[in-house]
Amino acid sequence: MAEAQNIPAGSTTAGSIAVAAESTVATRMSAPPSFDVADFPVPHGREEEWRFTPLDRLRGLHDGTAVATGDGVKVVVEAPAGVTVETVGRDDARLGRAGAPVDRVAAQAYSSFRQASVVTVAKEAVLTEPVRIAVHGQGGVAYGHQVVELGAFAEAVVVIDHTGDAVLAANVEYILGDGAKLTVVSVQDWDEDAVHVGQHNALVGRDASFKSVVVTFGGDLVRLHPRVAYAGPGGEAELFGLYFTDRNQHQEHRLLVDHNTPHCKSNVAYKGALQGDGAHAVWIGDVLIQAAAEGTDTYEMNRNLVLTDGARVDSVPNLEIETGEIVGAGHASATGRFDDEQLFYLQSRGIPAEEARRLVVRGFFAELVQQIGLPDVEARLLDKIEAELEASV
């Protein structure tokens, strides 16, 4: 039996590669996935999955003291022809199929939501306009649940836009039929006092393609947990993300790609910029290649650009492999300040120092913004980046 190896990933804040038949991402979790909140003890901050999160800023989402109010959030779905939009109760059989909660807040959300939004794209339907889901906080506490399901060979783009002020815990499910193609853009543009904790579960069918773009700007605390599993061979997943963490903000993205099926691919790329005292970004990237997942091809990357003193980044990529019969697997993580050579080059071409710094940050994010593919959303995010830069560069 292979002995586990811990190999530091160059230039990472933290990270390792573990190669072992008995060492999996699941073994590091304090409890297995469950829909029952009672299966998860109240966290105290010493647990591996909670050690980076300031529990006192969760407003009671983690210990059962956050009680839902009737005016927590308002959800509005705009969908083109050919899409079915339903509001369903807790007992609907279509809920919970993409995966179970993996922590207490997600389980609390699952046990506390009253109604769920279910968006269904019919088999072989190809949408020419995006589905837009607006989640607007109205100042209260809310628990939410959404399901987006594509039939076989359907194609769709979904934009989920979070705005306003709320204390929200929510689960989102993406279910892709065989050969389906789904792009999801999830934007967290909350007011500065908002708290948002979410788990996103994607179940990718045979030969299906899933692309997720997570964008996080606002909020006092945002903690997101995107997860991907495969329902058949040939599936592909791309997980992209960008975040801009300001003074005293806590933004945490914890990813898991579970390669549980042969001949699937995944590509993870997240980038963040930080500025101001107390700005804290956390990125955890877990990729598990199970013994049955021969022919896997995977890569994950996290890059962080620190714009001012007083900001902190914790970046932890983890790659765990249970079979040697793979196409490729790797990871990278780096955190740094402005590239002096880039700045010198731009200034030598007559570009003022302030504008040179702006160009570097724009270029840093450009490749991920372009992954969105929706001009109006891309323009809005570029405007947000410019507004953030006004405060620092």
Regions found by a protein language model. Give the residues of each.
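N-terminal amphipathic, basic helical "cap/leader" segment at the start of enzyme domains
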Residues: 2-115, 126-127, 131, 270, ...
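Conserved beta-strand/loop scaffold segments within soluble protein domains that form the structured core
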Residues: 6, 96-351, 361, 365, ...
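Generic hydrophobic-segment detector
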Residues: 28-31, 39-41, 299-300, 340, ...
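Residue-level "edge-of-site" marker
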Residues: 50, 359-360
